[in-house]
């Protein structure tokens, strides 16, 4: 396997059928049949032919195939691309069809899907603490690490042992620390999930998701299911995601370094903002041994802080120059979000910080200035 930077640029070379150096935007939804390959659907052994000879873009199209080639190489498995991270999670639930789902702290959208499955099909939801007591063969254990919105890490290897001892499968959502920061396969994950909207996309202008599995047959079934779920990534988004992947390693490395510097500054100077800054959450502040073992390439670019009042949470974003007050994360621009705006389950004094590719020094000065204003007013 070549290095990450090379795979990001050349992992789809084998799928290239044009002389364009940059992949073209394929807007067609339908493609002419090959006159030399007129074989009825019922006589096909499988649907792999659509990746080389596309038929209809809901099934596959040139740039979705290129994306899956790159993701399969850089994520060391069989990748299936989707229209969003939540579409990828839902596809996993449809495919594995568990009777019980064990979920810890996680993105509220995942919880909403779990609630739909419970309401419609009676799937049981349990906390991670109940694995030993309640889990059985074929159940799903779902873990985010690092977790949204805190950016803190959980022990993947320990949870994998607990899940596998009961015959359950472990899905790890590694969106907040995609490679080269973390390789969830190495710690026992059975399925790895990413919202490609975030760091892989990296420009706050597309939606996509990826599931990565270990067996080719599983990926084939997921792709077949995707045809009828209608959740393939769209043509324009796939082109934009291909463009973004070329620079992904440079961006994620810079963002990781910046976030670690910001967290270190806040931790070192917390006493200067003692009327405002209550708590700082980030993997770099954790002392457990597993954290550095998992995050081999650096800490995630998201962290969270809690302030003392809701009013301070409203005011902080207004005082920042280089952080947009917006939801989502992973783009080259830094964002802050008073998380209560979009997450109904969260502490209403929590601010999530998604660190971009600006100068770390400028970001530190900006955040320090805003906190000082609130400190002086407290």
Curated annotation (Swiss-Prot):
SUPFAM superfamilies the record matches: PLP-dependent transferases
UniProt name for this protein: Uncharacterized trans-sulfuration enzyme YHR112C
GO biological process: transsulfuration
Cofactors required: pyridoxal 5'-phosphate
Gene3D superfamilies: Aspartate Aminotransferase, domain 1, Type I PLP-dependent aspartate aminotransferase-like (Major domain)
Organism encoding this protein: Saccharomyces cerevisiae (strain ATCC 204508 / S288c) (Baker's yeast)
GO MF: carbon-sulfur lyase activity; pyridoxal phosphate binding
PROSITE patterns on file: CYS_MET_METAB_PP
Keywords: Lyase, Pyridoxal phosphate
GO cellular component: cytoplasm; nucleus
Family membership: Belongs to the trans-sulfuration enzymes family.
CDD domains hit by this protein: CGS_like (cd00614)
Other facts noted in the record for this chain: Present with 1360 molecules/cell in log phase SD medium.
Modified residues (N6-(pyridoxal phosphate)lysine): 198
């Amino acid at each position: 396997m070549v290095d990450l930077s090379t795979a990001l640029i050349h992992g789809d070379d084998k799928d290239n059928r044009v002389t364009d150096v940059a992949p073209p935007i394929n807007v067609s939804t339908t493609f002419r049949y090959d006159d030399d390959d007129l074989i009825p659907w019922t006589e096909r052994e499988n649907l792999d032919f659509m990746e080389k000879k596309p038929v209809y873009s809901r099934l596959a199209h040139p740039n979705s195939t290129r994306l899956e080639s790159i993701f399969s190489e850089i994520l060391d498995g069989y990748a299936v691309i989707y229209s969003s991270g939540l579409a990828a999670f839902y596809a996993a639930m449809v495919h594995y069809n568990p009777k019980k789902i064990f979920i810890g702290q996680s993105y509220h959208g995942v919880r909403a899907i779990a609630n739909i499955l419970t309401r419609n099909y009676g799937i049981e939801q349990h906390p991670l603490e109940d694995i030993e007591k309640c889990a059985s063969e074929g159940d799903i254990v779902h873990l985010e690490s690092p977790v949204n919105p805190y950016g803190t890490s959980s022990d993947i290897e320990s949870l994998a042992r607990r899940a596998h001892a009961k015959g359950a499968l472990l899905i790890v959502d590694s969106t907040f620390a995609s490679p080269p920061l973390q390789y969830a396969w190495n710690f026992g994950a059975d399925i790895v999930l990413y919202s490609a909207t975030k760091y892989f996309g990296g420009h706050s202008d597309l939606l996509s998701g990826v599931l990565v599995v270990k067996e080719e047959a599983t990926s084939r079934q997921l792709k077949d299911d995707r045809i009828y779920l209608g959740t393939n990534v769209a043509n324009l988004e796939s082109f934009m995601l291909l463009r973004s992947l070329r620079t992904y390693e440079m961006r994620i490395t810079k963002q990781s370094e910046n976030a670690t510097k910001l967290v270190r500054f806040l931790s070192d100077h917390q006493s200067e903002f003692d009327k405002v800054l209550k708590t700082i959450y980030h993997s770099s502040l954790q002392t457990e041994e597993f954290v550095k073992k998992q995050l081999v390439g650096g800490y995630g670019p998201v962290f969270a802080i809690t302030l003392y009042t809701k009013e301070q949470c409203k005011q902080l974003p207004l005082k920042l120059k280089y952080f947009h007050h917006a939801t989502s994360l992973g783009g080259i621009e830094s964002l802050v979000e008073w998380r209560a705006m979009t997450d109904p389950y969260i502490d209403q004094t929590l601010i999530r910080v998604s660190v971009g590719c600006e100068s770390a020094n400028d970001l530190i000065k900006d955040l320090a200035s805003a906190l000082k204003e609130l400190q002086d007013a407290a």
